Each structure stands twice: as structure tokens, then as C-alpha cells.
Amino acid sequence: MAVESRAVSTPVPQNSQEQELILVKVEESRSWGQKLKQSGSARSCQELFRQQFRKFCYQETPGPREALGRLQELCYQWLRPELHTKEQILELLVLEQFLSILPEELQIWVQQHSPKNGEEAVTLLEDLEREFDDPGQQVPATPQGPPMPWKDLTCLGAAQEFTHIQRQPLKKQLKPWEPCLPPKSGCENNESAIKKDISGEKSQRLSQEPSFGGFSEHKSSLEWQQGSAPGETLRRSPSQRASFSPVIFTHKLLANRDHPEPQRNLILSTNSVTYQKVPTEERPYRCDICGHSFKQHSSLTQHQRIHTGEKPYKCNQCGKAFSLRSYLIIHQRIHSGEKAYECSECGKAFNQSSALIRHRKIHTGEKACKCNECGKAFSQSSYLIIHQRIHTGEKPYECNECGKTFSQSSKLIRHQRIHTGERPYECNECGKAFRQSSELITHQRIHSGEKPYECNECGKAFSLSSNLIRHQRIHSGEEPYQCNECGKTFKRSSALVQHQRIHSGEEAYICSECGKAFRHRSVLTRHQRVHTVK
């Protein structure tokens, strides 16, 4: 595999002063990046820098060179090329764009789970297994009748640019609600009429919209289709939430038969992508907390559970509760053993589609998540996160009983069973219980007689891999256990322990009949026969 480049191409500074400034910023950013990595807050800060980069306005700087420099700085702080590989940076950009194209209802749900990459976002959506009432509503584009009012479309920057839309430089500081219209041309009279029309609709609309920090939040769902013809259907695009900018580009639908031809040509010449707003009467149910609207009251009720934390769907088996019935259905497959998703390669079945997707990577050998420290690759980002704790020494999971910490939650759960005495894994044959599933699997080989570990030298098979390792030392002659006192070596650690009792004088095995002590259990066993004969 080729060595991954971590460089991000940026415009070259025009003078030495700018170059020195950028170098200082890079060094400060690297130093701060290490602190963030240690404190565990890098994720939230990365999101903050992303928002600052996307919301940055030209009017915040005195000139174009300063604006470009500030954008470079914000982009560097967001994407962190000194910490991330080229593939990881691309993953961040793809994830951002993927979230932006989701329907509104899914956007909110996925963002609350904070996926770290596109694979995690897809897994969340597949686990949801719920069809929304209006995932991609088809709305007819009817040019007949009165023109529909338009909401504002916030400028989102390079990652969400709309092709063929001409963006003109602004001559003054615009207010959040002030439209950016095309430059004056021969149709000045038509433009003034357009401005008046848009301004009238805007003033009526602003009184009804909530305000957040001085900016109007534009929640409308926009219908888009490039080069659409009358009567064709348009696909709904989600609102671009959390992107407020003083530079607002307003696109007004004037290409209807009630306007003169010059007016229609003026608008369509500056915007070859046609938009259409879903009428508000089709979404009469509005959330009082976040302002999202829904077609049906049941959809609003389900959405409000995000804010209230209500979980009305309870499992009859274990009592666990869920906010959606689809979650409960997925959970109940644990108890029923139903596995509806089957691998076409090996036939193995799973109870969730996301589990099947992860399993398929075993067959494809795909390992897209690579460790920057040692280069080891993993099929899932969660595996990479756990692996990186080896390098960082991070152990975020702490036992409340004894304070011992662990790098994985599963290890903490197993450890806590020492304190609780819980043994959840029970053998169906003899009823013996174990703390870990691996112990149960090993035990069941006693009943089944299975010996999956075979010696390549002599063909002898064993039920435990540790037994095979010890056996192979017979062929290799390896004796890894050495006595510190005399230097003698042994194949097994137990043999070394017994040998060390010669030097220490320890006699660990005591006869309960006469009190005589022995170094080896086998010697004690032979001695006890003396008492048995009597």
C-alpha cells in the first residue's frame, strides 16, 4: 500500500510575513492538537471549527487576502492535516456532505448520535429500520397559479456548492434577511420590480419566523431538480440547519406565466437549478421545541420523544425500553434468536443489517481504518479507537468497586462479575456456569469431544490452544521458563514453580493425617496411601 500523504494543498503565501504567520499557526495548532487528544475533547472542538469554517463571511475581514488567510486557518483547524491522513480528511468531508443530503427527519436523529465517519452514519440508519412518512416526498412542479413564496438558501461554502449559480461580490454589509440579487443590467426596471416583490414577501414572512442569535433559521424544505420541465416531479432536499451566515442568497421562483418574459429570463439566467418549497399546509404539525414540521401527528409524536426522552415501547422479556417500536423489534431478536440477515458468502445469519455489513468485510478483506502510530489497519473505526488506546494508554472505563480501569467496556463488564459473583453463561449439559462466554465454549468441548487445535508435526489434536502451544515445545525443544537461581529452563511454567521450591525450601502440600509437608502434590498423593492402607 502506498504511503499516505497528510499534506493538504493550500495557496502559497505571497510574502515572507504571511508565510511566517502560517508557520506559527501550524506550530500552535499542532501543540494544541496534542492537548486536545489527551483531554478527549477533540471531537467537540473539531465540530466547532467545522461550523466556524462553514459560517465564515467575507464581511468579517478587511479584504480578500485576509479572508482567504482566515479560511485557510479555519480549514486547517477543522481538518487537522498534521493528525489525519488524506483518507481520513476525505472521510470527514464525505460525512459532512452525506449528513447534509439526508431528509430532515433523519438528519436530526443521526446528528444526535454523533457518527465519526460515513460507515457509522450508514450503520445508524440501517439499524433504525424505520420508514419515515415523508423520506423523499415527490411534489409536482405546477407553474400554474400564484407564485409560491421562497425561503432563504444559506450559502454553505465549497462542500455544498450549487453548480451554475452565479455568486456576485457584495458591495456592502448585508443584513441577515437582505437578498443578494444579480448585478444591474439592461432589465433595471424588471429588477426593481423583482426586488419589490421579494421584499414584500420577506417582510411578511420574517414576523412569523423564530430568531436565533439575531439570525433567522430557515427551515423550509427545498425541492430541486436541474433543468426540470413543467409537470415533472421534484425531489425534496433537506434544510441546511446550523449554517447561519450574514451573506444570504435568495432565489425567487418567478418563472410562472403571470410574470413577463424578461423577468422570467432574468431569474432563470442566474440560476439554472430550479427550487420549489413544499406548501406549509402539507406539514401542519410543528414541534414547539425545534420548529420542525411534519405531515402527520404520529410523526410529530415520535419526533418529540427525542426531546422528552420518552421510551414507551418496553421489552416483555428484560424490561428494556425504547423510543421507537422498530428499535424494540430489533431488540426482541436477541431473545427470539431470529436472524433475518444472511451472508451470501458463508451463510452466517445476523439479527441486524449493520452486523451483516461488518461481517462481509471479513470476506472482502477491507480494512479502511488505519492506525497512524503503527500502521495497523482495521475493518471498523470502533476497532481502531480501541486499538489506539494501546498507544495512548487511555483506560476510560473504571470499576466503581475497586477503582481498577480498563481500555474496553467489555473488560470492565467481565471484571465486575468478580465482585457480583454473576455467572451468566451456563452449560446446557451439566449446568455449570461461567463468567465469560469463552470459558463456556472451552468447557463444552469436554462434552462434545471437539479438539479443534491440531499439531502440524504429529497430527495430535487438543481442545485448548494453550495445550497445543505446550505440546509444540516437544518438537521445537523450546524451554522458555528459566530459573533465576540456577538458570535451569523448563517447557512449562508449572514445572518452573515446582523447581523453585527446591531453592526456597517451600513445602506447599501438607498431609491432613500426620502434618508432613511435601514440595510436590504427586509425592503427597503417594504418601497418603500409607494412611489409607492402615
UniProtKB/Swiss-Prot annotation:
It comes from the Eukaryota. Residues 197-242 are annotated as: Disordered. Residues 50-132 form the SCAN box domain. The modification Phosphoserine is found at S31. One of its GO terms (biological process) is regulation of transcription by RNA polymerase II. The keyword Cytoplasm does not apply. A zinc finger (C2H2-type) spans 285-307, 313-335, 341-363, 369-391, 397-419, 425-447, 453-475, 481-503, 509-531. Belongs to the krueppel C2H2-type zinc-finger protein family. This is Zinc finger protein 397. It comes from Bos taurus (Bovine).
